[in-house]
Regions:
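Thiol-/selenol-based redox modules, centered on thioredoxin-like
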Residues: 170-178, 223, 286-295
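Typically the conserved alpha-helix immediately C-terminal to a functionally engaged Cys/Sec
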Residues: 210-226, 292
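Membrane-embedded alpha-helical segments of integral membrane proteins
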Residues: 84-133
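Internal/C-terminal transmembrane anchor helices
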Residues: 137-164
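Thiol/disulfide oxidoreductase modules built on the thioredoxin-like
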Residues: 263-295
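Functionalized membrane-embedded alpha-helices
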Residues: 7-28, 50-89
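Thiol-based oxidoreductase modules, predominantly thioredoxin-like and allied folds used
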Residues: 228-244, 253-263
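Short active-site neighborhood of thiol/selenol oxidoreductases, capturing the structured segment around
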Residues: 190-212, 218
Length: 295
């Protein structure tokens, strides 16, 4: 080929585009990505929030650096290191029998660890002939490289700031209608066990994505001893389907009691927004959370 440098650059384009797509997919489904990281129990919830955004920003930066080709060696080694690191992690998941979505492409593309590991190996093979490409020349080269390193992180934090940065703002909202809750309790619409000592009651919808994510969050928080160990009671809004099997299997949560509430009463208590998680003592609400401030 007359221009071998062009051929080497072509082999950088696909990994660069895939890094950008992977980062965008994770950002779109960042709530699921956060909970996925948190579910391993290696990091605190707040650390998981920050780590998720650092991974996304790093992928954006690598994708941009690969395509811009202004510092090819740094971009190449960075991409290889990230793919190799992820591959070791995915290999461990595969060997441990994990077949869940590994969130490599967020929730847009469901890949299990084995499938994602194959994808990473293919990307590494594609990157091999891209080594040694000559950098493009442009004015203000150092400035562009700096911007590609800094802007992605700043943009991710602006578009999706970590929830723990905004707990005080979330705490000012009232996700539960306390009067409607008390009336439902007095009328026997809610289980009598709610007035017996400490209880955690979760107002969920079976198909609600954030209800499922909050359930997964509760599971990990309790495993770490960071959430109430009181009996866990689910109150689902009644719909055509009352089979909780899929919800329980997807989230891994175990309830001590499961109840259903008519839609009008359910929406009145939750102010039309769910999930709502209430901490009770003898029927009195002592703390209440939505998905965002649940910690």
């Amino acid at each position: 080929m007359k221009n071998p440098n062009l051929l080497k650059y072509v082999f950088r384009v696909l990994p660069g585009i895939l890094f950008l797509f992977s980062a965008t997919a994770k950002l779109i489904g960042i709530d699921a990505f956060e909970i996925y990281l948190f579910s391993f129990g290696w990091f605190s919830l707040g650390t998981s929030f920050v780590l998720a955004r650092l991974v996304i920003a790093a992928e954006y930066t690598l994708g941009l650096l690969l395509l811009a080709n202004l510092c090819p060696k740094t971009a190449w080694w960075g991409a290889v290191a990230m793919l190799a690191g992820f591959s070791v992690f995915l290999g461990w998941l595969a060997l441990s029998g994990n077949r869940e979505n590994c969130n490599c492409f967020g929730e847009l593309v469901n890949l299990n660890p084995v499938q994602s590991l194959v994808k990473n190996l293919v990307m590494l093979l594609i990157l091999l002939p891209a080594y040694g490409v000559q950098p493009f020349q442009c004015r203000f080269k150092k400035l562009w490289i700096t911007l590609m390193a800094v802007v992605p992180l700043a943009a991710v934090l602006i578009v999706s700031p970590p929830d723990n940065w905004r707990y005080s703002a979330y705490d000012r909202s009232e996700p539960v209608n306390r009067q409607a809750f008390q009336e439902a309790l007095d009328q026997g619409l809610l289980p009598a066990s709610l007035v017996e000592g400490d209880r955690v009651v979760c107002f969920y919808s079976l198909k609600c994505r954030f209800c499922k994510l909050s359930a997964r969050k509760i599971v990990t928080l309790r495993e770490r001893g960071e959430f109430s160990e009181a009996p866990l009671i689910a109150v689902f809004g009644r719909g055509e389907n009352t089979d909780t099997t899929e919800f329980l299997e997807e989230t891994g949560i175990t309830f001590d009691e499961i109840h259903f509430l008519e839609p009008d009463d359910f929406l009145l208590i939750t102010n039309g927004a769910f999930p709502v998680i209430a901490i009770l003592h003898d029927g009195d609400i002592t703390a209440v959370y939505n998905y965002r401030n649940l910690h």
